[in-house]
Design a protein with these regions (language model features):
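Short loop/turn segments at beta->alpha junctions
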Residues: 31-32, 58, 69, 76, ...
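Short hydrophobic beta-strand element within catalytic cores of glycosyltransferases
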Residues: 46-48, 64-75, 91
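Short alpha-helical segment that forms part of, or immediately flanks, the ligand-binding pocket
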Residues: 37-41, 59-68, 81-82
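Acidic donor-binding loop of glycosyltransferase active sites
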Residues: 40-55, 70
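A charged, aromatic-enriched C-terminal amphipathic alpha-helix characteristic of glycosyltransferases
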Residues: 96, 100, 113-144
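Nucleotide-activated donor-binding/catalytic signature segment of Leloir-type glycosyltransferases, i.e.
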Residues: 3-6, 11-37
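Short glycine-rich donor-binding/catalytic loop of glycosyltransferases
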Residues: 51-52, 70, 74-81, 95-96
Length: 147
């Protein structure tokens, strides 16, 4: 199954497609952030698309997923791709490379349990260390106090 959440300019097209094709795809629309966090923990992975690369930008969805321990299927390049690869948080495909994304979805669904558990653990570890909001805020305060 593939469960899609969110809005945006293609929401109506997605709704129409899902309604007219019985392919195990479900579109849920937009949910409030807290409900979304709760919902995401029910799934094995989450797709993070980044169609337009912005130098220095990392999709905020990455930071939302890490503390939930949800492995990532990243579709994009740049810093987001590097973070996912270097920290073994999931699998990566180029923007628009639907063939690779499809292969990554299949690969993720067939990972041995130990490898899958390690991806989840890597997500949780990174959320508590490098990308811990409180730690980043303290580092920022120390940086500002130096001036």
């Amino acid at each position: 199954e593939l469960h899609l959440f969110g809005g945006g300019n293609q929401a109506l097209e997605i709704e129409d497609y899902v309604r007219t094709h019985d392919k195990g795809v479900f579109y849920h629309g937009s949910l409030p952030k807290e409900r979304m966090r709760e919902e995401l923990t029910r799934y094995h992975a989450s797709i993070i698309p980044l169609t337009v690369r912005i130098r220095g930008a990392v999709p905020s969805k990455l930071f939302d997923l890490l503390p939930l321990g949800v492995p990532i299927l990243f579709c994009g390049g740049g810093e987001g791709e590097e973070i996912v690869k270097e920290n073994q948080l999931g699998l990566v495909s180029a923007p628009g490379d639907y063939e690779r994304l499809s292969k990554n979805i299949r690969a993720m669904s067939h990972l041995p349990d130990e490898e899958y558990r390690q991806l989840k653990a890597n997500c949780l570890r990174l959320s508590q260390t490098t990308f811990c909001f409180e730690r980043q805020l303290e580092a920022y305060k120390r940086f500002l106090s130096a001036f």
